[in-house]
Amino acid sequence: WASQVSENRPVCKAIIQGKQFEGLVDTGADVSIIALNQWPKNWPKQKAVTGLVGIGTASEVYQSMEILHCLGPDNQESTVQPMITSIPLNLWGRDLLQQWGAEITMPAPLYSPTSQKIMTKMGYIPGKGLGKNEDGIKVPVEAKINQEREGIGYPF
């Protein structure tokens, strides 16, 4: 799973105890939170010992009574004991993101800004391959020196 930062929120799916949930990737959240209206009624929960800071005033805060099995967006095995409260969407916090091997990268550009603009205008999408189905090569072709001293690649 990969998501480029844009005006769209980074949302991904996870399967907890066999049930699929969609949630916002939130690197600022220490723990994962499931929306109260999405928490299955037959899953045990208890009043949380600690409150949640940073999402305003949540009056009802619960926590799963059990540590739950979870599969990440690319089937990464993990466990979670989520908090549960009235929020509009689920949040995947660092407790899960670390187990999923999540990374935040800001790669240095391989090409000049001018060439990037030209490629973008031609329909290139960063991270996708070239070609009609976006399945072509994704990295630049490296020039190799021909050590046989003949043909293409021979240094003059």
From Swiss-Prot:
CDD domains for the chain: HIV_retropepsin_like (cd05482)
Activity regulation field: Resistant to a number of clinically useful HIV-1 PR inhibitors. Inhibited by cyclic urea SD146.
Identify the residues that the record assigns to the G-patch domain, covering every copy: 111-156
Q: Does the keyword Oxidoreductase apply?
A: no
- Coiled-coil annotated residue ranges, if any: none
Give the top-rank taxon of the lineage listed in the UniProt record for this protein.
Eukaryota
Q: What EC number(s) does this enzyme carry?
A: 3.4.23.50
Family in the record: Belongs to the peptidase A2 family. HERV class-II K(HML-2) subfamily.
Describe the function of this protein: Retroviral proteases have roles in processing of the primary translation products and the maturation of the viral particle. Endogenous Pro proteins may have kept, lost or modified their original function during evolution. This endogenous protein has retained most of the characteristics of retroviral proteases.
Describe its assembly. Answer: Active as a homodimer.
Which protein, by its recorded name, is this? Answer: Endogenous retrovirus group K member 10 Pro protein
